[in-house]
Amino acid sequence: MRSLIIFIAILICGGTYCYAQVDFYDQLADSAASLVNPNIIYDPSYSILDYPNGDVVADRGVCTDVVIRAYRMFDIDLQRLVHEDMKMNFDDYPQFWGLNHPDKNIDHRRVPNLMKFFERQGQAKAHSLSPTAYSPGDIVCWDLGGGIMHIGIIVKKKSVDYQRHLIIHNIGGGQVIEDILFEYKIIGHYAYGP
């Protein structure tokens, strides 16, 4: 009897955790969608940022800033988290920029670094061509070609044909929601939550 009670308690607690996780990702998707602003100027220039919780000027940004700003709504500071992980594990991160130490002003704004962070600290998911493999709140990364990578967050809104969720991102036209899930080669698919 005692074993049955323990088993039921584990099921209840485990279910609560799973529900809380799903609820977080739904809230993340909604928060990300609230960032829509087509007037954001695409500006990849290097900026000296406050630390922690530093951000570029509010009317500017790139694709990574959409993700960073969405998580900040939950007091999750990717600038600090990425910087701390890179300080402890610098050699595990991409070495494309010729640096020999982390840079708290830019590291979290680079797609390859976010991919590595989400792989290390979150949940890497399969790169699938099935729309059902992607859920609101998931993070997706693409290879645009020519060495350019891109990142966005899946929102709840669906495509016109209701086949797939849309993405909030910034590829140069501001922070917008578009049907781009399968427009480019997917190179990363993650879930990251508290």
Predicted regions located by residue number:
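Sec-dependent N-terminal signal peptides
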Residues: L4-C13
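Active-site-adjacent structural segments surrounding the nucleophilic cysteine of cysteine proteases
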Residues: C18-G61
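...with weaker cross-activation on analogous glycine-rich loops/strands in unrelated enzymes
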Residues: F24-A29, K87-I168
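Sec-exported extracytoplasmic/periplasmic mature domains
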Residues: A33, N37, I68-I76, H83, ...
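Acidic helix-start/capping segments at beta-turn-to-alpha-helix junctions
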Residues: P44-T64, D77-H101
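Active-site-proximal alpha-helical segments within enzyme catalytic domains
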Residues: C63-V66, A70, P136
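Low-complexity, Gly/Ser/Thr/Pro-rich intrinsically disordered linker/tail segments
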Residues: R164-P194
